[in-house]
A protein has these predicted regions:
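Glycine-rich phosphate/pyrophosphate-binding loop at beta-loop-alpha junctions
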Residues: 1-25, 29, 33, 88-111
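Active-site-adjacent helical/loop segments in soluble small-molecule enzymes
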Residues: 27-81
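Conserved beta-strand elements of the Class I
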Residues: 84-86
């Protein structure tokens, strides 16, 4: 399962299909939060709660959206019971300071 951060990323399906032989994958297009480097309050609140609970910071461009999407799908019983889920944290934490500069005018902050 993949989580594109681009809005309108349907083209990725064809691109990926060129390189895979199996049909055991899919892209979840509902977790881009408006597109690349776009955020909303729900995402920021999730990221801050995740860090508080697990002591793991998430970046707002990639990993925060991935974790939000997977946790949302878990809550919706998307995955079969007993499914092993591996999430790979790809970094990006250096972008938090810049994002905070952009979102503080809305009264938001990534902790």
């Amino acid at each position: 399962v993949g989580f594109p951060v681009l809005k309108g990323a349907d083209f990725l399906r064809d691109d990926i299909q060129q390189y895979v032989k199996n049909a055991n994958w899919e892209l979840c297009m509902d977790y881009h939060f408006g597109g690349y480097a776009k955020v909303n309050k729900n995402l920021i609140d999730f990221m801050n709660a995740f860090k508080k609970t697990h002591d793991i910071p998430l970046d707002p461009v990639y990993t925060g959206k991935l974790f939000f999407g997977v946790f949302d799908l878990i809550a919706k019983d998307y995955f079969r019971e007993g499914t092993t889920i591996l999430l790979i944290h790809t970094g990006g934490l250096q972008g938090i300071a810049g994002m905070n500069q952009r979102i503080e005018k809305k009264g938001w902050r990534i902790d």
